[in-house]
Regions:
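12-transmembrane solute porter fold
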Residues: 18-34, 39-43, 50-64, 69, ...
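C-terminal membrane-cytosol helix-exit motif in multi-pass small-molecule transporters
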Residues: 181-200, 216-228, 245-259, 454-462
């Protein structure tokens, strides 16, 4: 039998094996990021085909992010028990099948269910890049490996909207669901060849399934409560009851995590004020990143008459600039005050959102692209500095749990951010069943205010 341990694979393929393994995991991450971004340019077409409004279509983005946020906390247990090869290959197989089924969806409910399934598998795959790099590379080569891995991760959101726009305009929105499948199919083949099996069966420990179920129910119910606010007239009691149940479930989750031997979220970390402030900043970052990625394509297609391809091309320069900004901001975060860099990023993004909030239908493509770039520069400065500010004050043994927590918080901010901006657009002014430019202006102002207010706790990080 072939030796599929780390040493066995290195002996079989030589030093290039490490890079083949990194490329394998990168394929999984690229597929999930592609899936998260490519659908946004298809939302307008989906609304028209199914005759639905913001109150339903936003679940294609919100459901994906919420499911990803919840299941990413389960990846550590799966990696410990099954190893990176079986976990990644299994998640990619399921992701592929769900994507294909979603492409044939006949109702909005079926499509939303497929997006939730995609998000659940994406949550399992997303943390594996850093895990693998730290397992197979020596300390002095990890930075280089993360840089190569990061290039692929950044490439996907830059190209995703362009690919999605082309598929929608030339074929159908259904091909947006099919798009990640070839990538994950190749990833399954490579995973079975290049990813290691664990050298021995690890000592088993109980997975915190009650915690995961409580967390998933809390997030889902809270998001649905927000969504139902558009039906406020005559439904106040139902909305209030749902909000109360969500609050009770959240309380039960906190109690569970405080008593569990292997909790999903280490509640004790929240005793560190700097970590709490950084997590508030991370929630604002999630709202900024996912909220703007949702809003920009829908805004320019619905209010400005852009095609799906034009909407994707509008996002492309911003994705490239984000890829350039990210490593630069990372180097600055090692030398400069983290809070100053984050506040600078907040200011840049808030300025971008305010410029969108005062735009009109005569605005040229170039100006819209420039404002999108401005927002991505802000996000590029926020992301690495927030991680530095959150993790630097902690003890070495807390870093793993803290890293997982801040990633979770950022995704949670994204899930609620998309829901809130979609609700704002839905409540706004409409004409012929579609939101007017004024409805989108309200959403952009809301995003700008939310992100700007986050500067207050971020400044108190003292990092």
């Amino acid at each position: 039998m072939a030796d599929n341990s780390i040493d066995g694979l290195r002996a079989r393929y030589g030093d290039r094996w490490r890079w083949l393994a990194v490329c394998t995991v990168m394929l999984g991450t690229m597929a999930t990021v592609l899936s998260a971004t490519v659908v946004n340019v298809a939302l307008h077409g989906i609304m028209l085909e199914f005759g639905i409004r913001q109150g339903q279509v936003h679940w294609l983005a919100t459901g994906f992010i919420a499911a990803m946020t919840t299941t990413m906390l389960a990846s550590s247990w799966l990696l410990d028990h099954f190893g990176v090869r079986k976990t990644l290959a299994g998640a990619m197989v399921l992701f592929t099948l769900i994507s294909i089924v979603g492409g044939f969806a006949g109702t909005p409910g079926q499509l939303i269910a497929a997006r939730i399934g995609q998000g659940a598998m994406a949550g399992l795959m997303q943390p594996m890049g850093m895990y693998l790099v730290f397992r197979i590379f020596p300390r002095e080569r990890r930075g280089q490996a993360m840089g190569i891995y990061g290039m692929g991760v950044i490439l996907a959101p830059a190209l995703g909207p362009v690919l999605g726009g082309f598929l929608v305009d030339q074929l159908s929105w259904r091909y947006v669901m099919f798009a990640p499948a070839p990538v994950t199919m190749l990833g399954v083949f490579m995973a079975w060849r290049f990813l290691p099996l664990p050298p021995s069966r690890p000592e088993p420990y109980r997975f915190d399934l009650p915690g995961l179920l409580l967390l998933g129910a809390t997030i889902g119910l809270a998001l649905d409560t927000l969504n139902r606010m558009q039906e406020l007239a005559g439904a106040e009691w139902r909305i209030g009851l749902q909000a109360l149940v969500a609050a009770i479930l959240l309380g039960l989750f906190v109690v569970r995590e405080r008593s569990a031997r292997h909790p999903l979220v280490n509640i004790a970390l929240l005793r560190n004020p700097a970590f709490v402030y950084a997590n508030l900043g991370a929630m604002a970052l999630g709202l900024a990143l996912f909220g703007s990625t949702y809003l920009v394509p829908l805004f320019v297609q619905t209010s400005l008459g852009f095609s799906a391809t034009e909407a994707g091309l509008l996002m492309l320069p911003a994705g490239i600039v984000l890829g350039i900004t990210f490593p630069l901001a990372g180097r600055l975060a090692d030398r400069q005050s983290a809070r100053k860099l984050v506040v600078f990023g907040i200011a840049m993004f808030a300025a971008s959102a305010m410029l969108f909030a005062v735009s009109d239908v005569t605005l040229a493509f170039g100006w819209l692209a420039l404002w999108t770039i401005l927002g991505r520069i802000g996000i590029g400065f926020m992301l690495p500095a927030l991680s530095t500010g959150a993790l630097n004050p902690l003890k070495p043994e807390q870093l793993g749990a803290a890293s997982s927590t801040i990633n979770f918080t950022r995704q949670l901010g994204g899930a609620f951010g998309v829901n809130i901006v979609a609700l704002t657009v839905e409540f706004g002014e409409h004409s012929d069943g579609l939101p007017t430019i004024n409805a989108f202006h309200s959403a952009w102002w809301l995003v700008a205010v939310f992100v700007a207010v986050a500067a207050v706790p971020v400044w108190r990080m003292r990092a």
